Amino acid sequence: MFESLWLQLQHPNTQWVLAGTLLLGTASGVLGSFVLLRKQSLIGDAMAHSALPGVCLAFLFTGQKSLPFFLLGAALAGLLGTFCIQLIPRLSKTKEDSAIGIVLSVFFGVGIILLTYIQQQGAGSQSGLDSFLFGQAASLVRQDIILIAGISAVLLLLCIVFFKEFTLITFDLAFAKGLGIPVRFLNGLLACLIVCAVVIGLQTVGVILMAAMLITPAITARYWTERLTGMIIIAGITGGVSGVAGTLLSTTMKGMATGPLMILSATLLFLFSMICAPKRGLAAKAIRLMRLRRRTSREQVLLAIYEQYEKNNLCVTVESVRKKRRLSPSLCLKALNDLEQERCIERIENGIWQITSKGIEKGYHTALKQRMYEVYLMHEMELANIESDQDYFDPDRLPRETRERLYSLLKLYGRMPERRKASHDAEKGQIANEF
């Protein structure tokens, strides 16, 4: 397999296709980042479907299969579709998503009708226009690939030159207008770049799948970073890798189109990112949720033990803790073992624990934090200027006046935690009445 792949890579046409799909994937990923952040993912799909009638009309007017004419016709049809998407909501009460659906289906339907008409003509069956539906990179010749690679390189260059301006109109359009930046021109330029990226991918990826090539690398990159620069770089790399992987797979798998394999490669990278990304991935979220659940159960068990300590019941069991907190036996036992490892409690008999001096101190602060938060919720209108999230509520960071006010309310309600220390000898001999 590897020997045949190596032999295929020595072929000049394979090398040109690899270079073309690499640049196409990179340009699609970079521009797709702006499309995703501007919440215009469906517009890319509509542009791709709108391009089909332009390809068919270009063939009808020229009578020959010429990729430059096809790209020109597809670009004009894509721009017309984009204009219609923006025009329909202005002239009617139709929302933008409905306008996208209308334009997508109407243009694609017209394209299918024209494609069927062409293939019923004498030379239509030889035109190969059906390759624009799903893509057929193997049918590209050297001149076609040079054209696609050249346009992709120009798109990347323009994205680099106008990076600051595109970033500004993506995140804060009103601020850009206030600075006197030509927003309308930049929006039009970005739309033209997106149309060009869609158009040059039609012969390789196809009308139906090109939107996925535009969006999937951007979504993949979003899992790995919070910064736009990093997102664009990762999206470009993801798109390029997907293009190369799809080309290599189609080279080794006879009869398989390059476009679907490129999308499949991008989808696999997306699934890997969705699961394994360090911050946004499902695995990382599951680990954080598990740690949060374990920390919360540990705090709840410590609070239950501390409340027993305030009532002079120094020893606890799993059942006595579960009477105070609704926890499963396994989770409660795990929390008790964690507290024992932290030296907040110590085991005096099998299944019986007692609180230590460290546990008293930690339980005091935990109880104080929770009870102050409860009092804050009772007087939220009076104390509305402090952090309202319990996870970030820290009494030590509160203003002195606010903290003293909460202390006085705790004393008023009799909820102030006790900080007394019991003698260790007395603790060892005392067992709670529940046992």
Swiss-Prot record:
Residues folding into a coiled coil are none
Q: Transmembrane ranges? A: 17-37, 42-62, 68-88, 98-118, 143-163, 166-186, 189-209, 228-248, 255-275
Sorted keywords for this record are: Cell membrane, Ion transport, Membrane, Transmembrane, Transmembrane helix, Transport
Q: What does this protein do?
A: Probably part of the ABC transporter complex MntABCD involved in manganese import. Probably responsible for the translocation of the substrate across the membrane.
For this protein, the record's PANTHER family field holds: ABC-TRANSPORTER METAL-BINDING PROTEIN, METAL TRANSPORT SYSTEM MEMBRANE PROTEIN CT_069-RELATED
Q: Which family does it belong to?
A: Belongs to the ABC-3 integral membrane protein family.
Q: What is this protein called?
A: Manganese transport system membrane protein MntC
Record the organism: Bacillus subtilis (strain 168)
